[in-house]
Every structure is written in structure tokens, then in C-alpha cells.
A protein has these predicted regions:
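Catalytic phosphate/metal-binding cores of nucleic-acid and nucleotide-processing enzymes, i.e., regions
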Residues: 1-136
Length: 136
């Protein structure tokens, strides 16, 4: 299995920013948005390199993602978390050289699982499946 995990709270008390957070930064200033996006992508790329160790899928692949959000405090909308995380993860996979591109010729959306957990276990787990390994 080819799984990489982004562990810990990297944006405020969450693992990754939500869509509202990204939009707020873009409204504030384009450079602020770009800085936040680059910081998050750098964190994700380091996790890709640490866990996948140069592995690349053969052709088309599918991403199955598990989002572990903190159970206490302000719960974020599922849609906001998924939209922003997918964007950041897809761009990081391309920038790390793991994927050639993030268009539908190379990447299919798989399953999204969303769970609430302790603050200690805030994370996003990404499973990258080759075309032959994926389940529809």
C-alpha cells in the first residue's frame, strides 16, 4: 500500500486549512494566500517524500483520503475541509514529482472518510492506488 500521512496541527489547531481559510487569505492579500499555500504544500511534500520514498504510480491513480479533525471546539464543514485539502494535496503530489499532472487523465477521486479525533491525532491520511489496485 502507498500511504502518506500529514500528522499534527499545521494550521492553527487543524492539520490543513479549510476552503474558507484559503479564501480569507486570498481576500486579505494575494501574497498572503500564496505564502499560506506554499507553506502547506511544503509540509505535504515532505510527508510524501518521507512516506512514499520516491514511489510513483503507473498511469492513472486514485486517491482515498481520511480526514482526522479534532473533536473539541469549532467543528469545520466537511465540504470546506475536503475542497482545500484536495487542492493542496493534488498540487503537492505534482510538485513533488509523484504525479505528472492532477487532471483526470492521471488522477481519479476516490473515497473520502471524515472522522473526529483527539487533538493529538489530528491528521490527513492519503492512500494512492494504481489503476489496477483501485476499487470502484
Amino acid at each position: 500500500m502507498n500511504i502518506f500521512t500529514v500528522n499534527g496541527a499545521h494550521y492553527k489547531s487543524n492539520c490543513l486549512p479549510g476552503l474558507n481559510d484559503l479564501l480569507r487569505e486570498a481576500e486579505r492579500h494575494p501574497i498572503a494566500y500564496n505564502r499560506l499555500k506554499k507553506e502547506m504544500e511544503a509540509i505535504i511534500i515532505s510527508c510524501i517524500r518521507r512516506d512514499l520514498r520516491g514511489w510513483k504510480p503507473n498511469g492513472l491513480c486514485q486517491l482515498n483520503i481520511v480526514y482526522g479533525e479534532k473533536s473539541k471546539g469549532n467543528r469545520r464543514d466537511y465540504d470546506n475541509v475536503v475542497a482545500a485539502a484536495r487542492k493542496l494535496i493534488n498540487d503537492a503530489l505534482v510538485k513533488s514529482g509523484t504525479l505528472k499532472d492532477d487532471n483526470p487523465s492521471y488522477l481519479l477521486y476516490g473515497k473520502n472518510k471524515f472522522m473526529y479525533t483527539d487533538e493529538v491525532f489530528v491528521r490527513v491520511e492519503i492512500e494512492v492506488l494504481n489503476d489496477a489496485d483501485r476499487s470502484d
